[in-house]
Amino acid sequence: MTTKGTPSRRAARALAFQILYGLGFSPAASVKQLREAYASSPDVADKGRSPQPEGFAWELIEGIWTEQANIDEVIGLFSQNWRIDRIGRVELTLLRIAVYEMLYRIDVPPKVAINEALELSKQFGDANARGFINGILDAAAKALEGGQLKPRV
């Protein structure tokens, strides 16, 4: 159960997706600009959420922003024949959220991170991209499970 202004984890992921997606068009150069992007998001202001970055959505946004190079490296390992700059912005943002959760959130099982990315792809992405997203995330999850990829907590 969530209280007014405190989104569920799925809603927090959706909020993080929207802000991170927007940052793809106008990147933040500092944490201050990242906080401003959060506070000015219509999904924060229009839904009565605190403009102060907090909670799970903010953790995802700040963590992905901070660790983007590492996250993109992992995505690159498993996106056979696809360079990061060739992956669609929606798909890349969804992949970044899920890979971040797999690597940096021990409380989120990889299967949950994959399922949540696929659910968000139904809301924001193209149906044809789900197999692509699932393939990359499944390969990353198997590498984590097999010890070839290490959590970075």
UniProtKB/Swiss-Prot annotation:
UniProt record, GO biological process? DNA-templated transcription termination; transcription antitermination
One CC-aspect GO term: cytosol
The Gene Ontology terms for molecular function here are: RNA binding
InterPro entries, sorted: NusB-like_sf, NusB_fam, NusB_RsmB_TIM44
Which UniProt keyword terms apply here? Answer: RNA-binding, Transcription, Transcription antitermination, Transcription regulation
Q: Which PANTHER family match?
A: ANTITERMINATION NUSB DOMAIN-CONTAINING PROTEIN, N UTILIZATION SUBSTANCE PROTEIN B-RELATED
Primary role: Involved in transcription antitermination. Required for transcription of ribosomal RNA (rRNA) genes. Binds specifically to the boxA antiterminator sequence of the ribosomal RNA (rrn) operons.
| Family, as annotated | Belongs to the NusB family.
Q: Which NCBIfam families match?
A: nusB
Official protein name in the record:
Transcription antitermination protein NusB
Organism classification, top ranks? Bacteria, Pseudomonadati, Thermodesulfobacteriota, Desulfovibrionia, Desulfovibrionales
